[in-house]
UniProtKB/Swiss-Prot annotation:
Keywords: Flavoprotein, FMN, NADP, Oxidoreductase, RNA-binding, tRNA processing, tRNA-binding. This is tRNA-dihydrouridine(20/20a) synthase. Its cofactor is FMN. It catalyses: 5,6-dihydrouridine(20) in tRNA + NADP(+) = uridine(20) in tRNA + NADPH + H(+); 5,6-dihydrouridine(20) in tRNA + NAD(+) = uridine(20) in tRNA + NADH + H(+); 5,6-dihydrouridine(20a) in tRNA + NADP(+) = uridine(20a) in tRNA + NADPH + H(+); 5,6-dihydrouridine(20a) in tRNA + NAD(+) = uridine(20a) in tRNA + NADH + H(+). Belongs to the Dus family. DusA subfamily. Pfam families: Dus.
Length: 336
């Protein structure tokens, strides 16, 4: 596998297409998950988990930035609010070969709020603008923002428009809009993905009012048919948990959303391509479940799906030969 690291010389890449992307998801979109998803779609833009500026600047940056060359197009999502720190991290991302740097202005968790990260920054548009400008001044890699449509106490359209307008003035040209407000007190991150109502109409108003900006819609999208419908209004769509729990949805993204004439990869073909990656990971001292935990949804809707999940989530931990257990699971999806 060809790994790119922070020491890999940066080569200029074209601006990535954001027509279809998989959202940054904590504990889920690690490098193993992204390698697997890339086997299903060549065109999808993939995002890392959010990485804080502190993690990159005060720990082993290589551990957070390393990725396989096949993962491109690939964006790094940063969490932070100190412009100089974000600029330094953007430089690390550019040196490591990332295709985009994205600032998290959408995460509602208490833990990140306490560090001035995530959705709480929607109350500070001038600071977000300063952060974006610092990153743009530091790198040629595209800098984007992912945000909510508001936060409790600051949820009017006028305030959202002011936020986008100020950040646009700092040079940001692409905004990914999670079409819910974030409730910063009293709701868990999970509840913040479910309880505040989806307001696609507000995101659509942003696109009408800022026609020069790229507006990518996120939140509650579950099918490629829905993606097609939203693409009549928006420049791109981003899927989160649906893409993780039902990853085979990605297998037809290239054909349906990008017009590719490449054959659709089967589930068993994707797993056959994943096997050498698993072997290499284990030979380097890693555990099989680091990879296989991300593929449990691949059998969704098939007879034998429960057995598939059991083999890969429980039986591999007890097996003397975990690769043999993986092969058993693959057999359940042969020809599918």
């Amino acid at each position: 596998m060809s790994l790119e690291t922070a020491s890999t010389p940066h080569t200029t890449r074209p601006e990535p297409s954001r027509r279809f992307s998989v959202a940054p998801m904590m504990d889920w979109t690690d490098r193993h998950c992204r390698f697997f998803l890339r086997l299903l779609s060549r065109q999808t833009l993939l995002y890392t988990e959010m990485v804080t500026t502190g993690a990159l600047l005060h720990n082993d940056a290589h551990r957070f930035l390393r990725h396989d060359a096949s993962e491109h197009p690939l964006a790094l999502q940063l969490g932070g609010s100190v412009p100089a720190d974000l600029a330094a991290c953007a430089r690390l991302a550019e040196e490591a070969g990332y295709d985009e740097v994205n600032l998290n202005v959408g995460c509602p968790s208490d833990r990140v709020q306490n560090n001035m990260i995530g959705a709480c920054l929607m109350a500070h548009p001038a600071l977000v603008a300063d952060c974006v400008k610092a990153m743009r001044d530091a790198v040629s890699t595209p800098v984007t923002v992912k945000h909510r449509i508001g936060i409790n106490g600051r949820d009017s359209y006028a305030e959202l428009s002011d936020f986008v307008g100020q950040v646009r003035e700092a040079g940001c040209r692409s905004f990914t809009v999670h079409a819910r407000i974030a409730i910063l007190e009293g709701l868990s991150p999970k509840e913040n993905r479910e309880i505040p109502p989806l307001r696609y109409d507000i995101a659509a108003q942003l696109k009408r009012d800022f026609p020069d900006l790229e507006i990518v819609l996120n939140g509650g999208i579950k099918t490629l048919d829905e993606c097609q419908a939203h693409l009549e209004t928006f420049d791109g769509v981003m899927l989160g948990r649906e893409a993780y729990h039902n990853p085979y949805l990605l297998a037809e993204v290239d054909q349906q959303l990008f017009g590719s004439d490449a054959p659709v990869v089967s589930r068993s073909e994707a797993l056959a391509q994943l096997r050498p990656y698993i072997v290499a990971h284990m030979e380097s001292g890693g555990a099989m479940h680091h990879v296989t935990r991300h593929i449990l949804g691949l059998a969704q809707g098939f007879k034998g799906a429960r057995r598939f999940r059991q083999l890969l989530s429980a039986d591999i931990h007890k097996a003397a030969e975990p690769l043999a257990v993986f092969d058993q699971a693959v057999e359940l999806l042969q020809g599918r």
